[in-house]
């Protein structure tokens, strides 16, 4: 289905708005993928806050022009799905995890912090824990000494309570 000029401008504006707030873009080839698989991928992306879209490459090139992601333009060839996220690792994680399950999704490239990433670098980025995971680990590490101290104090209080009960 071809788009008229106004529709194309609207698509470019929508993508440019997503790109303006994004930290990461991941580009994956999707030849021969079944509709049910693409639906699962879209649902997973939505859960993780990743904007996932199949676009005409010329429209995608226009949307990323004059942004830190402009270096990806050379990689925009063939049938591609674009994962765009504000979280530095979410798009890479969603597409990389799905590519492990469905071999019809092939990661081509990505861009983070103005640098174009290859397939191996996108996989590395996907292996990094998300910000929320890191914060929960940090909180656990900070709480561990406090909860340990609380258990020790409770055990001491319990022991003193037993000692007083025996003396009475």
Swiss-Prot record:
Family matches, as InterPro entries: Ribosomal_uL10, Ribosomal_uL10-like_sf, Ribosomal_uL10_bac, Ribosomal_uL10_bac_type
GO molecular function: large ribosomal subunit rRNA binding
Keywords assigned: Ribonucleoprotein, Ribosomal protein, RNA-binding, rRNA-binding
GO BP term, pick one: translation
Short name of any one Pfam family annotated for the protein: Ribosomal_L10
Function of the protein: Forms part of the ribosomal stalk, playing a central role in the interaction of the ribosome with GTP-bound translation factors.
Alphabetized PANTHER family for the sequence: 39S RIBOSOMAL PROTEIN L10, MITOCHONDRIAL (PTHR11560)
Annotated family: Belongs to the universal ribosomal protein uL10 family.
Name of the molecule in the record: Large ribosomal subunit protein uL10
Source organism per UniProt: Laribacter hongkongensis (strain HLHK9)
